[in-house]
């Protein structure tokens, strides 16, 4: 590892690896590759079928609690839940989010270390999926986000701000503009839904940006195995824990397993 290593982040693993680069980066990451990551967060939880009112009602209830102390310390998805739909929710994100708000350097006091470490990357590769439905907005994979309520001109909440027109890029909060000027940012699209890695998608990345010598098929299958721990499974576990804690009857402070 003295010469560094290439890092691949699947789904939420993408922003967590970026957090490693920004905060530590020892040993150093050479090329950072993210598949379907939520670099600018998500504005709604995935999982409900279209028209499923009960499911949507439950999810909306959980979304309203994403910035509670319990959620911020126990739920993985809460670390990158960035709700820009309502001014009150966005203010909660700014005040209480413990991860994404920090690694995106969105606060008034910028961490120069984050920018310095990102600039050490040789390549930062971001892959999105053409039929993405899990990540909302899907452009979050490329650092695009819905405009925050403070800067919206009207009530339209579904217009995304591209990376290169965002303040994060223009003011170079985490070094992306520097990487772009150097030709070190790469944006790719793979056909399919969230985390459907087709052979062409694998070849695009694993035969171009990762590893020396090239990855063989066995290595790619091992990497794909990690992907099978899906975002849905993690969210389901988190929601079950959250439901027990948030909806526990008053006065029932005992922790037990039945």
PLM region descriptions:
Residues 1-91, 134:
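Serine-dependent carboxylesterase/thioesterase catalytic core
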Residues 12-16, 105-109, 166-171:
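Short amphipathic alpha-helical surface micro-motifs
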Residues 12-16, 96-99, 202:
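Alpha-helical interaction elements in eukaryotic regulators
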Residues 52-102, 143, 147-149, 155-182:
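Active-site gating loop/helix substructures
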Residues 73-138:
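Serine-hydrolase catalytic core
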Residues 81, 250-251:
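Intrinsically disordered, low-complexity regulatory regions of eukaryotic regulatory proteins
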Residues 113-247, 258:
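C-terminal catalytic-base region of ester-bond hydrolases, centering on the histidine
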Residues 252-258:
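Non-transmembrane, juxtamembrane loop and terminal tail segments
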């Amino acid at each position: 590892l003295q010469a560094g290593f290439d890092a691949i982040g699947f789904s939420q693993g993408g922003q967590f690896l970026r957090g490693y680069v920004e905060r530590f980066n020892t040993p150093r990451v050479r090329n950072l590759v993210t598949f379907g990551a939520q670099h600018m967060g998500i504005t709604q939880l995935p999982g409900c079928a279209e028209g499923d009112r009960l499911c949507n009602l439950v999810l909306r209830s959980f979304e309203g609690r994403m910035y509670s102390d319990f959620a911020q310390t126990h739920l993985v998805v809460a670390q990158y839940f960035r709700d820009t739909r309502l001014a009150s929710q966005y203010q909660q994100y700014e005040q209480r989010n413990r991860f994404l708000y920090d690694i995106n350097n969105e606060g008034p006091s910028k961490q120069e270390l984050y920018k310095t470490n990102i600039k050490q990357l040789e390549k930062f590769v971001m892959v999105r999926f053409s039929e993405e439905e899990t990540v909302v907005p899907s452009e979050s994979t490329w650092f695009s986000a819905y405009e925050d309520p403070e800067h919206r001109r009207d009530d339209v909440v579904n217009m995304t701000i591209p990376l290169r027109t965002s303040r994060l890029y223009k003011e170079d909060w985490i070094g992306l503009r520097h990487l772009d000027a150097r030709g070190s940012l790469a944006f790719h699209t793979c056909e399919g839904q969230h985390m459907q890695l087709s052979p062409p998608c694998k070849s695009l990345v694993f035969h171009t940006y990762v590893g020396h010598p090239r990855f063989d098929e066995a290595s790619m299958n091992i990497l794909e195995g990690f992907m099978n721990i899906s975002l849905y499974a993690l969210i389901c576990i988190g929601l079950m824990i959250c439901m027990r804690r948030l909806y526990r009857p008053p006065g029932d402070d005992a922790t037990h397993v039945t």
